Amino acid sequence: SITRDIWISKKENNERTYQKITSFNGEDRNPIWSNDNQSFYYLSEKNGSFNIFKCNLNGSNEMQLTHHTQHPVRFLSSSKNGLLCYGYEGEIYTVKEGQQPQKVAISIVTDQTETELAHQIKSSGATEIAVSPNGKEVAFILHGDVFVTSTEYKTTKQITDTPEQERSIDFAPDGRS
């Protein structure tokens, strides 16, 4: 059985040092830096199912941000304004520290003028997610294609329509692509 912990590696004067930050006898994984680089967020299953935690770089001041019980939290990411985004039970959620998680409502708007069968696409089953640097858009992969949705409006656009499986989505630092 795997039991991952989180470590910090530092390089000073061509010498690398390692410091163990978490030591839970289970899974702690997927760390991401906070905006101030003085702490980090990560996923831990220490309370039964994976949830989002935050702690300082020395492992102190640990705080649990989400409290899901049925299923694990997956695909943790963060925007430059501190908005965290994650997958839970096939849906996409966002949360800011000290607030309750919000499910991202996703609906598809089309420009089609012909009478065609319109498929309703929901975020259920999304396999990867990424938050734009300003926190206003969320990209996700659903059934192998990339979609982008607004966190402020009910607009979702399908970006790709290929036979290939898309993967490893992310926003450019300027948020334009």
Give the role of each language-model region:
Residues 1-7, 15, 20-29, 34, ...:
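A flexible loop/linker signature enriched in serine peptidases of the S9 family
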Residues 63:
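Flexible glycine/proline-rich, aromatic-decorated loop/lid segments
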Residues 103:
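Acidic/charged, solvent-exposed loop-and-adjacent secondary-structure segments enriched in E/D, K/R, S/T
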Residues 121-130:
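Signature of short aromatic-glycine-proline-rich micro-motifs recurring in repeat-based ectodomains
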Residues 130-136:
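Extended repeat-based solenoid scaffolds, especially LRR ectodomains
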